Amino acid sequence: MSATAEDNARGAKPAGNFARTVSQRKRKRLFLIGGALAVLAVAVGLMLMAFSQDIRFFRTPADLTEQDMASGSRFRLGGLVEEGSVSREGSELRFTVTDTIKTVKVVFEGIPPDLFREGQGVVAEGRFGDDGVFRADNVLAKHDENYVPKDLADSLKEKGVWEGK
């Protein structure tokens, strides 16, 4: 009996079939690796899109576009509390944020920070309502009478309206 006939009698597969199954395994492994890389690429892309909205700490009133006002997406609005703009109506605190170029009306429901006052730096987090008023659910104020957030000071300096240090 020849060697091939003996191998066939013992149940061994012919060499041609073995080569075919190896190439099928390689192909399956390649598809599996390719699929995993595609899923990973999509996941990284989605994460980058989610983080891209939080790259800037806040937007000033002059930075806002019609799209920001209409989209309903959350962001941080930074600027100075305009003198004479603070009022209380029930549990709502109403004030205007300015960067001395443009102003935005803000409504905040809650207790403002202890250091919140007119003429001071503020960052309000929320979204625009249908009425065009910024609805803040979180308000951050400056630390002391000489402090203005660095990002806000830099932004105001760029616009040529900053008179501080």
From Swiss-Prot:
UniProt xrefs under Gene3D superfamilies: Nucleic acid-binding proteins
Entry similarity comment: Belongs to the CcmE/CycJ family.
Gene Ontology annotations of biological process type: cytochrome complex assembly
Membrane-topology descriptor: Single-pass type II membrane protein
Entry protein name: Cytochrome c-type biogenesis protein CcmE
Cellular component, GO, one term: plasma membrane
UniProt keyword annotations, A-Z: Cell inner membrane, Cell membrane, Cytochrome c-type biogenesis, Heme, Iron, Membrane, Metal-binding, Signal-anchor, Transmembrane, Transmembrane helix
Parts of the chain that traverse the membrane: 30-50
